[in-house]
Every structure is written in structure tokens, then in C-alpha cells.
Amino acid sequence: MSKSSPKGLCCTASWPPTRPTRPLGHPKQGRFEPTHAGLGGYLYVADTLAGAVAEGVLRNQTISKAGVVRRPWLVNKKLVRVSLVSDVTVASVYGSGATKLNLDSALLCGGVSQYSQTRETGTKILLKTKPAFGMRYRCRNHDNLTSLMLITRKDPALSLTLVDEVDIFFDKRGRDLILGVLHTEFQLQYTGLLPN
């Protein structure tokens, strides 16, 4: 178990709590999204910009040997910064946290074909860990980064405040942030036309 403090978090994907849970094997399922409706909605976040890029831009992309970022990876996406209203407890499912849970890190870092299994495992962890409002896990696209999946639960529900929101391609500020991280952290570059 670890604490996540009320600082800026970068959102990478979400599934509103008002929608039913996705079935196992759904083509758009995330690695840990809950399979049990009682856990509420969820939000994938990173506590660094590099983590948000790894999960929100590079997730499931085939990267060429030339290291070129494709335009579709960047369009129709926003960088959203939120803040937790108060500290929350999350289950750590990497490093010694995974060892304490008798988990094989190969399972937790597997590809999309293993997401049904990781979803079931993550749901079991959250159902048995009542104080946890999510899980912190190793990022698949960067060994030195971790990401979080936060859940809403009920009584008391998780509370977030919107801090900032910017389009990562059409807004120059967002584009500069994302392209800068792609270059410095991942040694990737976008070579296509840029909007005005």
C-alpha cells in the first residue's frame, strides 16, 4: 500500500461510473479497469508528464526504427491535470508490492492479450483491499515510471479537482509539452505538419 497525495496528476483515460463495466476481452479494455460494478468508475492517471505520455500517447503503438511519432497518436487527445482533494491509499502492484501479493511481474507488465487476466487480478486486489482507491503499477512503456488507476468506490467517494486541460496537438502549449517529452524522455519525434 502507498499514499497518493493531492498534487497534479495527468489523466490519460477514463470510463464514467454511469456506464456498465466493459466485458472481458473488449478491444478497448485497459490493463486494470475493474470488472466489478461495486468499485465504481475509474480513471487512469500518471503523476508525471512522461507517465501521461507513455500511457496516453504511446500505449499500444508500434514505434518505427526511425523513432517517428505519427499524427493519429496525437489528435483527439487532451492533457488534463487534476488534483486529489485529499490523500488516498492505493495498492502497489509492482516491485516489493507485487511480491507481497504473490504476483508475477510478467503478468502485470504483459501486453494487451493479457488484459483480461490483469483486469480480473486487479479487481480481486481492490475488492480485498477496502481502503484502496486504486492501484499504482509499473508503466509498460518506461521501466522507471509508474502510473495509477484510481477508482471512485462509494462512501466516501474519491474527489478530484480539475486544474488544467489542453489539447495536445492543436494547442501550442499542449503540443510543446508533449513533443518535448517525446523527444527528451523517449527519443521520439514528430516530423509532420503542425497546425497554426
Each model region followed by its residue ranges:
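Active-site and NAD+-binding cores of ADP-ribose-processing enzymes
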Residues: 1-27, 62-196
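Extended catalytic/binding region for NAD+/ADP-ribose chemistry, centered on the ART fold
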Residues: 32-64
